[in-house]
UniProtKB/Swiss-Prot annotation:
Biological processes annotated in GO: cobalt ion transport
Cross-referenced NCBIfam families: cbiO
Functional summary from the UniProt entry: Probably part of an ABC transporter complex. Responsible for energy coupling to the transport system.
InterPro entries in the cross-refs: AAA+_ATPase (IPR003593), ABC_transporter-like_ATP-bd (IPR003439), ABC_transporter-like_CS (IPR017871), ABC_transpr_CbiO/EcfA_su (IPR015856), Co_trans_ATP-bd (IPR005876), ECF_ABC_transporter_ATP-bd (IPR050095), P-loop_NTPase (IPR027417)
Keyword field contains Transferase: no
SUPFAM superfamilies: P-loop containing nucleoside triphosphate hydrolases
Protein name (Swiss-Prot/TrEMBL): Putative ABC transporter ATP-binding protein AF_0731
Length: 293
């Protein structure tokens, strides 16, 4: 497990992380969502030591992260970070050289190295690209190349910052398959994304950030609410829970309740007729003000 405990971090005088607590387990996909500027990338860069907190700590499989050169090199073999901008990660002239860079540094060579690179490129749909110049790839192809480099390292944890950005439908399907495969292999995967469809498809646990803080977390979350929280501000309305005065008024359906919740997340005040136990239980999942009449 990777655990961030009470992380604080500043860029100059601006506090970007404000006491963040976060966990990512092996064999699970942990999804991090929130609007731009919420602090997601800053948090992710702490998980393998790319950034050092002002206070707080990061614990990886029971051991607190140390920041000397030797410790960081070991951590980055086990916790691979796929950058939001793949150009920040691509270091070599050709596709083959870039994917081979990490495994070579781990001592792989010959047929074993060839096999690792070949399998990684095949997994991301870049077979046949070995001799291509990285500079000639499209944005989506560069992103898949960055993921291939992660696969070739065979890390215990893989952190993906916005892996679906600039990727077409086929590329997105492939990325989702890769994430699922990593989970099946027992890897811990952390995905930061604005894509609620991808989050719903692959996520096992969800965190939502705003203004440098975790504002919601849970194992299950509505697709529509996740989308709203992922790309909108957290200006919330109110739900008024009222008893129906009409004896034959039908029970509130799940779809109706979800629409009401979405309106509340948009800042509206909505009235929900009926106080069925399931309605009350559903409303307790959301950080909304609920008033009973």
């Amino acid at each position: 497990m990777i655990e961030a405990v009470d992380l604080h971090f500043c860029y100059g005088d601006a506090e970007v992380l404000k006491g963040v607590n976060f966990k990512a387990e092996r064999g699970k996909v942990t999804v991090l969502m929130g609007r731009n500027g919420a602090g997601k990338t800053t948090l992710l860069k702490h998980l393998n030591g790319l950034l050092r907190p002002k206070s707080g700590k990061v614990i990886i499989d029971g051991r607190e992260l140390k920041y000397d050169r030797k410790s960081l090199l070991e951590v980055r073999k086990r916790v691979f970070y796929v950058f939001q901008n793949p150009d920040d990660q691509i270091l070599s002239p050709t596709v083959w050289q870039d994917v081979a860079f990490g495994p070579r540094n781990l001592g792989l060579k010959g047929e074993r190295l060839e096999r690792v690179v070949r399998n990684a490129l095949e997994a991301v749909g870049l077979s046949g690209y070995e001799k291509r110049l990285c500079s000639t790839l499209s944005g989506g192809e560069k992103r898949r190349l960055a993921i291939a480099s992660a696969l070739a390292m065979n890390p215990d944890y893989c952190i993906m910052d916005e892996p679906s950005a600039n990727v077409d439908g086929e590329g997105l399907r492939m990325i989702a398959e890769i994430i699922r495969k990593l989970r099946e292999e027992g890897k811990g995967v952390v995905v930061s994304t604005h894509d609620a469809d991808l989050a719903k498809e692959v996520g096992d646990y969800f965190y939502f950030m705003d203004d440098g803080k975790i504002v919601w977390e849970g194992e299950e979350f509505s697709y529509s609410v996740a989308r709203k929280l992922g790309i909108r501000s957290f200006s919330l309305g109110k739900v008024i829970l009222a008893e129906s005065k009409i004896d034959d008024h039908p029970c509130f359906s799940a779809d109706e309740l979800e629409r009401a919740v979405l309106k509340a997340f948009e800042g509206e005040t909505v009235v929900v007729l009926g106080r069925d136990d399931w309605v009350i239980k559903e409303l307790e999942k959301y950080p909304l003000e609920v008033e009973r009449l």
